[in-house]
């Protein structure tokens, strides 16, 4: 079951290096079951890593827990996130994972979405400009805040957190 933070790293490693999959062997990669335990950022990262993986299979280890139940409702009520899974949008890694076993920045093949992960235990800025993608405006699907990506190529993320940006222009 996919419930530890290291499992999120494992999935990102698989999708970083597994893009030999071209829908001829398997139609979808397999993100495994997504659990919502741990803190909010970790649960969000598990959900978003499943989007990168290509499908969603949701479950939780304790849906009776009020905090986890709120987290489930919050994270799974974002229709645009669910549409990414429904539309089978494929993501590819766009950063070099020299010091890690996985990429931290992914772009959808249709260039409509960028996903950024901070898989460290500290808050940090993840920079994307060196990745060859130069979007101008991105909208964070979680906060609905628009970001001028032409003014900054770095995105501040809390420890073990992630975001999904819709590329506006």
Q: Residue locations for each model-derived region?
A:
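Active-site-proximal substrate-binding groove within the catalytic cores of carbohydrate-active enzymes
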Residues: 1-144, 155-164
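Short, solvent-exposed S/T- and G/P-enriched segments that are highly enriched in secreted/extracellular
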Residues: 149-154
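Short beta-strand-to-coil "C-cap" segments at the C-terminal boundary of structured domains/repeats
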Residues: 165-169
